[in-house]
């Protein structure tokens, strides 16, 4: 993952690994420069331990993929697929001006053993 630095040379970390189920079909659009954008929703559920207590963790987050390199690969992502997403988080504003946290994916793996090789996007 990318690590950027502040002017003071302190590292700024922004990386996320989240697994879950694909909760929507992949939608495609283009930005004003003609670059394809793909997006879908990922639902995560797990049990986490915090201060020696178990708690249920749940979230639903939009996954964003930008670029031509994802055009064929996104066709493999189906509703209900179990995947692991590697990327960074960012805030998008919706049509009402409300901020929404999203994850920009850089790498996705299928968790389902029926998918060949398990990896959707090779690491660069």
Swiss-Prot record:
Residue span(s) of domain SSB: 12-112
Gene Ontology terms, MF aspect: single-stranded DNA binding
Biological-process GO terms, alphabetical: DNA replication, synthesis of primer
InterPro entries named in the record: NA-bd_OB-fold, Primosome_PriB/ssb, Prisomal_replication_PriB
Pfam families: SSB_1
Domain of life, per lineage: Bacteria
PROSITE patterns according to UniProt: SSB (PS50935)
Keywords, comma-separated and alphabetical: DNA replication, DNA-binding, Primosome
GO CC annotation terms, alphabetical: primosome complex
HAMAP family attached to this UniProt entry: PriB
Quaternary state and interactors: Homodimer. Interacts with PriA and DnaT. Component of the replication restart primosome. Primosome assembly occurs via a 'hand-off' mechanism. PriA binds to replication forks, subsequently PriB then DnaT bind; DnaT then displaces ssDNA to generate the helicase loading substrate.
Cited function: Involved in the restart of stalled replication forks, which reloads the replicative helicase on sites other than the origin of replication; the PriA-PriB pathway is the major replication restart pathway. During primosome assembly it facilitates complex formation between PriA and DnaT on DNA; stabilizes PriA on DNA. Stimulates the DNA unwinding activity of PriA helicase.
Entry's family note: Belongs to the PriB family.
Name of the protein this chain belongs to: Replication restart protein PriB
């Amino acid at each position: 993952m990318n690590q950027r630095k502040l002017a003071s040379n302190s590292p700024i970390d922004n990386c996320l690994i989240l697994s879950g189920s694909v909760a929507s079909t992949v939608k495609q659009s283009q930005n004003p420069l003609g670059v394809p954008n793909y997006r879908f929703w990922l639902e995560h559920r797990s049990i986490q331990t915090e201060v020696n207590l178990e708690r249920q963790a749940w979230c639903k987050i939009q996954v964003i993929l930008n670029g031509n390199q994802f055009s064929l690969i996104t066709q493999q992502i189906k509703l209900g697929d179990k995947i692991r997403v590697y990327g960074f988080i960012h805030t998008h504003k919706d049509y009402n001006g409300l901020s929404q946290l999203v994850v920009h994916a850089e790498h996705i793996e299928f968790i389902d053993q029926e998918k060949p090789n398990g990896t959707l996007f090779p690491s660069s």
